């Protein structure tokens, strides 16, 4: 199956990353598939082998799907084990593979701390600070499950907060997604950038409380911290001419909207994203924003067809990807992330 998928990909030298979405049976199969993916990529692409990430989420429209990223024209690059460095005019960027723990059956906090330790070493080796991270994906097995009064997502948030405590976030946190997977433990992907010749700003949403300012009442589970720590991310970031839209759900202020079906939540979520990406909300001069990708996570597979119908009718020309995944609050049925270009 991987061979057939790879044959559909342009094998140009500037291939940066392949993210595979597929549902394995369990953690053992996930580990086997991940090893096979890395070996197959090296065999098929040779010296131009891209970074890889394997997300344990089923696709709605196929048994396996891939998102493929290319290095922009004119950007020099260095391939390393587990990450790639991009060098442009006045900036350096670090793109990671999907970083996984050695033991995906360990506790969520232990896995998260191990991954953040790996990430810290990658960044430090090339002079990046933790606060240079501008986009982060956090895939968390059984994200809303509670073990011994501790919610998996809150365990991750506490580990992330401790990692982030070592950095100066005066320019805002990364854009981020925290989403559930069926298995595979914790997996994190990161984009980081440093340099003076680049636009890089946080974007707030006028209709939402910043996630890092949430009150204790919307956080779940027991914690070892003095209090439960908040999810440390911004609603979006603009880097260059690209707006990176964080995982967004039907939340106004800090409270989930009481909408009992996925299509209604999808419509409200896209209205919230419109507020976020409105030209008068972008902290740099622009006359228009244009979506270039919308990735939709759907909690219940039996609601997928209606969600797809809604999105395809409203956004027919935008590339879209539909996945089945649990969202960070039990009452939320949809989460949408994406990218947009400013004009």
Regions found by a protein language model. Give the residues of each.
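N-terminal presequence-like segments and the immediate start of the first folded domain
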Residues: 1-137, 142-343
């Amino acid at each position: 199956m991987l061979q057939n998928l790879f044959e559909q990909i342009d094998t140009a030298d500037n291939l940066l990353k392949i993210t595979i979405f597929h549902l394995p049976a369990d953690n053992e199969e996930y580990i086997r598939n991940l090893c096979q993916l890395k070996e197959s990529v090296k065999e098929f692409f040779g010296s131009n082998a891209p970074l890889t990430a394997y997300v344990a989420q089923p696709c709605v429209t196929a048994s396996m799907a891939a998102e493929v990223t290319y290095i922009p024209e004119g950007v020099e690059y260095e391939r390393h084990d587990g990450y790639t460095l991009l060098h442009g005019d006045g900036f350096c960027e670090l793109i990671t593979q999907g970083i996984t723990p050695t033991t995906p059956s360990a506790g969520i906090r232990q896995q998260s701390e191990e991954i953040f330790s790996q990430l810290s070493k990658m960044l430090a080796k090339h002079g990046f600070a933790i606060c240079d991270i501008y986009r982060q994906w956090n895939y968390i097995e059984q994200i809303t499950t509670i073990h011994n009064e501790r919610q998996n997502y809150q365990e991750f948030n506490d580990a992330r907060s401790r990692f982030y405590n070592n950095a100066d976030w005066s320019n805002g946190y990364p854009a981020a997604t925290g989403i559930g997977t069926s298995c595979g433990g914790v997996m994190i992907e990161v984009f980081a950038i440093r340099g003076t010749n680049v636009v890089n700003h946080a974007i707030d949403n006028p209709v939402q409380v910043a996630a890092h300012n949430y009150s204790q009442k919307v956080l779940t589970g027991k914690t070892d911290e003095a209090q439960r720590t908040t999810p440390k991310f911004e609603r979006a970031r603009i880097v260059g001419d690209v707006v990176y839209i964080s995982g967004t759900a039907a939340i106004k202020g800090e409270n989930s909207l009481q909408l009992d079906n996925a299509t209604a939540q999808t419509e409200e979520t896209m209205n919230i994203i419109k507020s976020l990406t409105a030209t008068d909300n972008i902290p740099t001069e622009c006359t228009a924003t244009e979506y270039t990708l919308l990735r939709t996570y759907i909690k219940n597979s039996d609601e997928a067809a209606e969600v797809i119908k809604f999105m395809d009718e409203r956004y027919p020309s935008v590339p879209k990807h539909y996945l089945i995944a649990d969202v960070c609050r039990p009452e939320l049925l949809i989460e949408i992330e994406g990218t947009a270009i400013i004009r």
